[in-house]
Amino acid sequence: MSYPITDIDGIDGEAAAVLKSVGIRSTERLLEEARTVKGRKMLAMKTGFDEKLLLFWANVADRMRIKGIRKEYAELLQAAGVDTVKDLKYRNPANLAKAMSEANRKHKMVRLLPSEKVVGNWIENAKKLQLKISYK
């Protein structure tokens, strides 16, 4: 699934304008451009954004490929310790739902927590997705 680039936390106003100036308007396009170390280096040179920030945004976009995960849940997963789609594949639904509840209690990120069943569906969907981001 692809969403407007501004659906990623931290990409608004000026950041969105810079990304749009290099042809990145969607989460799908960001993921394509920032999926490799080389791609992130090139994008950093074009935009002036730090490579680590670009990787962070790419990981959010990657999590948003999973059916049912939009901005808020992608960020909540991060707060619960799930940085990547690959991380999500190996999680236990009950433990992750609990970790998400604890993270939400601390940070108040979403109004409605996903059920353990929904979290389990996310995990199953993550297992079916082809990995997009390389880290080496």
Where do the PLM segments sit?
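C-terminal extensions
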Residues: 1-136
